[in-house]
Amino acid sequence: MAWDMCSQDSVWSDIECAALVGEDQPLCPDLPELDLSELDVNDLDTDSFLGGLKWCSDQSEIISNQYNNEPANIFEKIDEENEANLLAVLTETLDSLPVDEDGLPSFDALTDGDVTTDNEASPSSMPDGTPPPQEAEEPSLLKKLLLAPANTQLSYNECSGLSTQNHANHTHRIRTNPAIVKTENSWSNKAKSICQQQKPQRRPCSELLKYLTTNDDPPHTKPTENRNSSRDKCASKKKSHTQPQSQHAQAKPTTLSLPLTPESPNDPKGSPFENKTIERTLSVELSGTAGLTPPTTPPHKANQDNPFKASPKLKPSCKTVVPPPTKRARYSECSGTQGSHSTKKGPEQSELYAQLSKSSVLSRGHEERKTKRPSLRLFGDHDYCQSVNSKTDILINISQELQDSRQLDFKDASCDWQGHICSSTDSSQCYLRETLEASKQVSPCSTRKQLQDQEIRAELNKHFGHPSQAVFDDKVDKTSELRDGNFSNEQFSKLPVFINSGLAMDGLFDDSEDENDKLSYPWDGTQSYSLFDVSPSCSSFNSPCRDSVSPPKSLFSQRPQRMRSRSRSFSRHRSCSRSPYSRSRSRSPGSRSSSRSCYYYESSHYRHRTHRNSPLYVRSRSRSPYSRRPRYDSYEANEHERLKRDEYRREYEKRESERAKQRERQKQKAIEERRVIYVGKIRPDTTRTELRDRFEVFGEIEECTVNLRDDGDSYGFITYRYTCDAFAALENGYTLRRSNETDFELYFCGRKQFFKSNYADLDSNSDDFDPASTKSKYDSLDFDSLLKEAQRSLRR
């Protein structure tokens, strides 16, 4: 081999040829030794150093192809030009040596970087016959420093089994080798021996490398062992981290271009720094995989029992109310960790169970309402509920303020109608029991799948807003309290227990309509009853109570689309949901007043909470269809009246224009009939009545007008009924002049009377005028003649 021949020469030739050409390429022994002791390492530039090695990469391939099969004539076929170029490269690269923190040339840094570089550019055929992996991108200098092993040695003499073909594939990645050898030669000029070069260099960042490269699993384990071990481990991070290392360790046994043989103590076999995959794995390990772990609890558990099933043992009583879960437990269930979701919750621990229990129990004991009300409920205990956790603290604070403010609000409201509900008759008790049993039977069974379905919850949030936003505004409550103060509590006592008690409305989202519970509207042409009038029988709930009220169950199912379209937005300032009773356009057969009724959609149940003691008749900020109907009707009436006025004005203007045109025609006719006399040079103080009286002696006058000129002279027009009278006035009108007046100017009315005296009438000479004399030659031509004339002019 060429390497064995060169090993007998000087140390400089040995190192230089090994770096530039390779361990199995012909070497050049004629290069003179250079004294590099006076070089200043501070002037070295890494970029120019790496750029200057382009010749080495190209020439090494040329030399490999040219002298591959002739090792005996190696030194005879290297010409002087290659020697000169080699010297030029050496001289240029001496100025680009990097410097470490101690002021010495960073030889081992580049050497370690070369180990990684040559390792990435693996040869096409390995000594053990395994196929090489794909060539990875050349890492940066920082990656070379961090990813190189700590005790890399340059044992060039140990690499003696590589073939020429293996090295030929490395010629394009061998650029940094000359810098390694020359750097060693430049700063270790005192001892030029290969033993110095083979001395292990301790890396400054070895401690960092030990910390970064620490791994629980050995890097040289087989893929089957890794799969078995990772199956036993719970962390998915180790499984994703060790398998790429083991796969690359199996597919890529180590054969480096540098003489790090598998027999050397620095065997990089199974090293975690063989390729880019290990770098990516290391970056994942450093950054952490907390956000990559999948949720441990699926959104839907079909194999478990329904945790939201209400207890059937609860019985309604006037003074017993099931205590709702506390706020701490309610919010901890929604924002708990994922590990807690893996354990199955009991029915009493789920928040939706508390929702159903609360909604299915009749709240007769209104002294319990004086205590703090439960805060808002969040829907699920799954991973998709975590989106509302960011607002949990704000909602808790708002809910606490709400409950504190609600303590005093319900004292006045509950004291008046508390006894009315609690002291109801036996028939009313039967009615309440039937209602409660119906809600218990329908709610857990028919809505079981709906409560567990994420789409139904999302649909509820879409139409009615999220319950986290359904919070009362204290200012709004105070304002409405002043408005509601003047209303009697007697009408509120007649409100149905269905609304006051917060029972579940089973037919809320059912579109079915029964004849018994169908709501009749007066505009539909059917018989209508007031919603809160006392009905003789509660037909919708089959209750014999005469004093109870029967709000039809289809009130909220008759027109669900309109209700949902009007109740999409919850706001913190106006937290009342737009319901058929309030702020919506749904036609509720109530009075013209509106309500501040608030609807909380919790656990797919529609809970109606009336605002303090204000029934649906009380005037409030919400607008009902009846309150807006008069304004709407008046607007239509005003619009109709305005249209009528516009039409009348147009007709009047049309009539006036017709009258004016008629008067103008009559005037022209009178002028043509010579019935209009022009009277000029009258006194400026002459009135129309005076002028009319003076000229009426000649006949009946139809119209008389007086006009003033700018120069102070006045004139008038007198229209007689008959032409003969006009002629008489024209002939004898001068006799009416007084002694202090000038003579009148009397003419038949025409255009001449309004022009200057020097006006010349040119119409008398109209017979002498020949209009044909002014025509050009083109006027006498027809269209065809004109077209031909134009074409001839274009040809010219």
Curated annotation (Swiss-Prot):
Give the CC-aspect GO terms: apical dendrite; cytosolic ribosome; euchromatin; neuronal cell body; nucleus; PML body
Keywords attached to this entry: Acetylation, Activator, Biological rhythms, Nucleus, Phosphoprotein, RNA-binding, Transcription, Transcription regulation, Ubl conjugation
Pfam families linked: RRM_1 (PF00076)
What the record says about the induction of its expression is: Up-regulated in brown adipose tissue of diabetic fatty (fa/fa) rats. Exposure of fa/fa rats to cold resulted in a much smaller increase as compared to lean rats in which a 2.6 fold increase was seen. Leptin is required for normal basal and cold-stimulated expression in brown adipose tissue and hyperleptinemia rapidly up-regulates its expression. It is induced not only by cold exposure but also by prolonged low-intensity physical exercise in epitrochlearis muscle.
Q: What is its main location?
A: nucleus
Q: Where is the composition biased (Low complexity)?
A: 577-597
Polar residues: which segments have biased composition?
114-127, 242-258
Bias type Basic residues, positions: 561-576, 620-629
Protein name, per record = Peroxisome proliferator-activated receptor gamma coactivator 1-alpha
Which species?
A: Rattus norvegicus (Rat)
